[in-house]
Amino acid sequence: MGLLWDFIITLLIIWPPYVANATPVVASKLFKRRTPIDFGRNFIDGRRIFGDGKTYEGFITGLLAGFVIGELTYIIVAKTVNITLELPAPLTVFIMCLAALLGDLTGAFIKRRLGLPRGAPAPLLDQLDFLLAALLALWLVQPSILRVIYVIIAVLITPPIHLATNAAAYLLGLKREPW
Protein backbone atom coordinates (compact mmCIF):
# COMPACT_ATOMS: atom_id res chain seq x y z
CA MET A 1 0.00 0.00 0.00
CA GLY A 2 2.99 2.27 0.00
CA LEU A 3 4.91 4.51 2.30
CA LEU A 4 1.84 6.05 3.94
CA TRP A 5 0.61 2.61 4.96
CA ASP A 6 4.10 1.72 6.26
CA PHE A 7 4.03 4.94 8.29
CA ILE A 8 0.64 4.05 9.80
CA ILE A 9 1.71 0.50 10.65
CA THR A 10 4.91 1.84 12.19
CA LEU A 11 2.92 4.20 14.41
CA LEU A 12 0.66 1.36 15.50
CA ILE A 13 3.61 -0.89 16.32
CA ILE A 14 5.49 1.71 18.34
CA TRP A 15 2.42 3.22 20.04
CA PRO A 16 2.48 0.93 23.14
CA PRO A 17 6.19 1.59 23.87
CA TYR A 18 5.60 5.32 23.36
CA VAL A 19 2.82 5.20 25.97
CA ALA A 20 4.96 3.12 28.32
CA ASN A 21 7.82 5.61 28.02
CA ALA A 22 5.65 8.71 28.51
CA THR A 23 3.44 7.51 31.36
CA PRO A 24 6.05 7.71 34.16
CA VAL A 25 6.21 11.49 33.65
CA VAL A 26 2.49 11.73 34.42
CA ALA A 27 2.73 9.11 37.18
CA SER A 28 5.36 11.19 38.96
CA LYS A 29 2.69 13.84 39.52
CA LEU A 30 0.06 11.35 40.68
CA PHE A 31 2.03 9.51 43.35
CA LYS A 32 3.01 11.35 46.51
CA ARG A 33 5.56 8.72 47.41
CA ARG A 34 8.09 7.80 44.76
CA THR A 35 10.53 4.96 45.31
CA PRO A 36 13.70 5.19 43.21
CA ILE A 37 14.49 1.93 41.43
CA ASP A 38 18.08 2.20 42.62
CA PHE A 39 16.89 2.94 46.20
CA GLY A 40 19.27 5.91 46.25
CA ARG A 41 22.33 3.70 45.87
CA ASN A 42 25.48 4.57 43.99
CA PHE A 43 27.33 2.51 41.41
CA ILE A 44 31.02 1.59 41.80
CA ASP A 45 31.96 4.95 40.27
CA GLY A 46 30.30 6.76 43.20
CA ARG A 47 27.44 8.11 41.08
CA ARG A 48 23.79 7.16 41.36
CA ILE A 49 22.83 4.05 39.43
CA PHE A 50 19.76 5.60 37.77
CA GLY A 51 18.76 8.65 39.84
CA ASP A 52 15.59 9.81 41.55
CA GLY A 53 13.72 10.16 38.25
CA LYS A 54 13.43 6.41 37.71
CA THR A 55 10.88 5.03 40.17
CA TYR A 56 8.99 1.81 40.73
CA GLU A 57 5.73 3.72 40.56
CA GLY A 58 6.60 5.17 37.16
CA PHE A 59 7.94 1.87 35.85
CA ILE A 60 4.89 -0.17 36.85
CA THR A 61 2.43 2.51 35.73
CA GLY A 62 4.24 2.84 32.40
CA LEU A 63 4.25 -0.91 31.85
CA LEU A 64 0.54 -1.25 32.60
CA ALA A 65 -0.51 1.85 30.65
CA GLY A 66 1.56 0.91 27.61
CA PHE A 67 0.12 -2.58 27.56
CA VAL A 68 -3.53 -1.68 28.23
CA ILE A 69 -3.68 1.40 25.99
CA GLY A 70 -1.72 -0.39 23.27
CA GLU A 71 -4.02 -3.41 23.32
CA LEU A 72 -7.15 -1.24 23.37
CA THR A 73 -5.82 0.66 20.38
CA TYR A 74 -5.17 -2.58 18.52
CA ILE A 75 -8.69 -3.84 19.30
CA ILE A 76 -10.26 -0.60 18.08
CA VAL A 77 -8.15 -0.53 14.91
CA ALA A 78 -8.85 -4.20 14.17
CA LYS A 79 -12.59 -3.58 14.45
CA THR A 80 -12.63 -0.43 12.32
CA VAL A 81 -10.17 -1.32 9.54
CA ASN A 82 -11.31 -3.91 7.04
CA ILE A 83 -7.76 -4.92 6.20
CA THR A 84 -6.06 -7.73 8.06
CA LEU A 85 -3.19 -6.24 10.03
CA GLU A 86 -0.36 -8.19 11.53
CA LEU A 87 0.23 -6.39 14.79
CA PRO A 88 2.15 -7.56 17.84
CA ALA A 89 0.39 -10.21 19.93
CA PRO A 90 -0.62 -9.24 23.50
CA LEU A 91 2.40 -10.94 25.09
CA THR A 92 4.66 -9.22 22.56
CA VAL A 93 3.11 -5.84 23.40
CA PHE A 94 3.78 -6.45 27.09
CA ILE A 95 7.39 -7.45 26.38
CA MET A 96 7.89 -4.43 24.10
CA CYS A 97 6.62 -2.10 26.83
CA LEU A 98 8.87 -3.79 29.38
CA ALA A 99 11.82 -3.49 27.00
CA ALA A 100 11.06 0.19 26.36
CA LEU A 101 11.20 0.93 30.07
CA LEU A 102 14.38 -1.12 30.49
CA GLY A 103 15.86 0.77 27.53
CA ASP A 104 15.02 4.04 29.26
CA LEU A 105 16.68 2.76 32.44
CA THR A 106 19.74 1.82 30.39
CA GLY A 107 19.83 5.35 28.99
CA ALA A 108 19.68 6.78 32.53
CA PHE A 109 22.47 4.42 33.60
CA ILE A 110 24.66 5.57 30.69
CA LYS A 111 23.94 9.23 31.43
CA ARG A 112 24.95 8.77 35.08
CA ARG A 113 28.19 7.05 33.99
CA LEU A 114 28.90 10.03 31.74
CA GLY A 115 28.42 12.32 34.72
CA LEU A 116 25.23 13.87 33.35
CA PRO A 117 22.76 14.87 36.06
CA ARG A 118 19.06 14.05 36.01
CA GLY A 119 17.35 16.07 33.32
CA ALA A 120 20.53 16.86 31.38
CA PRO A 121 20.05 16.45 27.63
CA ALA A 122 21.70 13.55 25.84
CA PRO A 123 20.68 13.94 22.19
CA LEU A 124 19.54 10.73 20.50
CA LEU A 125 20.16 8.66 23.64
CA ASP A 126 17.17 10.34 25.28
CA GLN A 127 15.02 9.86 22.20
CA LEU A 128 16.02 6.39 21.03
CA ASP A 129 16.96 4.27 24.07
CA PHE A 130 13.40 3.12 24.74
CA LEU A 131 12.52 2.72 21.06
CA LEU A 132 15.52 0.59 20.11
CA ALA A 133 14.96 -1.67 23.11
CA ALA A 134 11.29 -2.12 22.18
CA LEU A 135 12.13 -2.85 18.54
CA LEU A 136 14.79 -5.34 19.61
CA ALA A 137 12.21 -7.08 21.80
CA LEU A 138 9.76 -7.22 18.88
CA TRP A 139 12.46 -8.66 16.63
CA LEU A 140 13.32 -11.32 19.24
CA VAL A 141 9.75 -12.29 20.13
CA GLN A 142 7.72 -11.83 16.94
CA PRO A 143 10.20 -11.12 14.12
CA SER A 144 7.70 -11.69 11.31
CA ILE A 145 6.10 -8.33 12.08
CA LEU A 146 9.22 -6.18 12.02
CA ARG A 147 10.18 -4.91 8.58
CA VAL A 148 13.26 -2.79 7.90
CA ILE A 149 11.10 0.09 6.66
CA TYR A 150 9.27 0.17 10.00
CA VAL A 151 12.58 0.46 11.86
CA ILE A 152 13.77 3.24 9.56
CA ILE A 153 10.52 5.17 9.91
CA ALA A 154 10.45 4.70 13.69
CA VAL A 155 14.04 5.88 14.12
CA LEU A 156 13.42 8.92 11.91
CA ILE A 157 10.13 10.05 13.47
CA THR A 158 10.83 9.32 17.13
CA PRO A 159 13.31 12.14 17.88
CA PRO A 160 11.00 14.95 16.70
CA ILE A 161 7.94 13.30 18.29
CA HIS A 162 9.84 12.81 21.55
CA LEU A 163 11.07 16.41 21.57
CA ALA A 164 7.59 17.77 20.79
CA THR A 165 5.87 15.71 23.48
CA ASN A 166 8.52 16.62 26.03
CA ALA A 167 8.10 20.31 25.20
CA ALA A 168 4.34 19.90 25.68
CA ALA A 169 4.91 18.12 29.00
CA TYR A 170 7.17 20.98 30.06
CA LEU A 171 4.54 23.58 29.14
CA LEU A 172 1.94 21.59 31.10
CA GLY A 173 4.21 21.56 34.15
CA LEU A 174 4.81 17.81 34.00
CA LYS A 175 8.55 18.11 33.33
CA ARG A 176 11.27 20.43 34.59
CA GLU A 177 13.09 20.50 31.25
CA PRO A 178 11.64 20.90 27.75
CA TRP A 179 13.69 18.03 26.34
Regions found by a protein language model. Give the residues of each.
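Transmembrane helix interruption/hinge and helix-loop junction motifs
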Residues: L140-V148
